[in-house]
């Protein structure tokens, strides 16, 4: 078939973009955002977080549940109320999630270096509003 020249050029530009920012800078930023989200979610009664306790072993993906609500309900509320997109369900890890006591799955927020503190604050505020 025809090679994807546009795809190759796009990949090259993406690599250049990341190199300019610096992978270490991206790692530091994502860790800061991840820690902020976890700290704020921990402060909400009924929210259970599934993440390594040591921040050095975390990545920018945080899984959590909200007591008394299905993950899909939480994801739909976040989308409807604040245009926040998260993943909900079993995340292709049914056996693991059942083993850790999440038979309905979890909500998974994915953070990237381009997210802002405001993005996290909006997500947390929306969850708080949902629980009122």
Feature annotation, model-predicted:
Residues 1-132:
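Pyridoxal 5′-phosphate
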């Amino acid at each position: 078939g025809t090679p994807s020249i546009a795809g190759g050029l796009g990949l090259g530009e993406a690599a250049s973009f990341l190199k300019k920012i610096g992978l270490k800078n991206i790692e530091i930023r994502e860790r800061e955002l991840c820690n902020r989200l976890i700290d704020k979610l921990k402060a909400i009664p009924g929210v259970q977080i599934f993440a390594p306790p040591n921040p050095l072993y975390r990545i920018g993906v945080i899984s959590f549940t909200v007591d008394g609500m299905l993950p899909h309900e939480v994801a739909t509320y976040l989308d409807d109320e604040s245009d926040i997109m998260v993943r909900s369900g079993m995340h292709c890890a049914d056996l693991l999630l059942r083993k850790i006591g999440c038979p309905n799955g979890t909500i998974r927020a994915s953070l990237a270096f381009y997210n802002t503190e405001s993005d996290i604050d909006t997500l947390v505020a929306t969850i708080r509003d949902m629980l009122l």
